[in-house]
Amino acid sequence: MSAPQDGEAGFVLLSVLAIFIVVGAVLAAAILQVRSATGLAQARADAVRLQGAADGIARLVAYELDLGRVYRRPGPGLPEDGTVTACPLAPGRTALLSLQDQGLLVDLNATPRPAMEEAFRLLGIPDREVLALAAEIVDYRDPDDVPEPNGGAELPQYRARLLPWGPRNAPFASIDEVDRLPSMTPAIAARLRPVLTVYNQGGRFDLAALVRRANPAAIRSLPGSAGPVPSPRQAFRLSVVVEEGRSRAGRSAILDLGGSGFVVWQQTVAPDLVAGTGHPACAAVAASLAAGP
């Protein structure tokens, strides 16, 4: 073969190789795209299944609580003080549940100031902050513009603290609003949040039970008059997280057994549900999901 023919053959070979490289790159990109789409679809399907399980568990617990109230029979048996329960489901899948009776908590709208002050002291809040916070809570929720004695705060006091907002002068809509109080700090808020609610309409609570759970070291400081106060067991905060591998889905709800049903139904993974202990009630939870995905 002559030199020109050799050169032409070499050029053709290089052209064919270039085409193969381009086609291979396109195919590789397409395969990666398909795999990525498949993985994304699988992740979405897993998330939907986990969310369905979380929602089903939340509705099951609510149903059992409602039956217990109507027919005066035992409910699901889960702890009602916010303790986290861990329930094994299918292999590799776990449900974390937390049930909190709101009638055991300090109500920002209904609990009288003296009762709030007593509870806050026993929870370890310094006396000066106790007086200010209790007064600010009352001023935030009451309709008038007259500051409470010993630390109250109406609009002028908020302005003096360089805060761009003032008191609502109406009931707290959620416990998150305590962050707006002039004397509230992140450390105090973290200590108080677990014992606060806006769903204990009667305002009364069992001080001894509250302190025993939130600050056991202060049990000996309880006043002799701190007798048991039964909860009306009407409102509950219910949080469920279902996890499998690295995937997690959750549901948080407020259940009113007085006839309103779910007054809050939020798709969220509660940050405090990361570990828990087993409980006999888990058997019923697992059985209810046995036929599910």
Language model regions located:
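Compositionally biased linear targeting/interaction segments
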Residues: S2, A9-P293
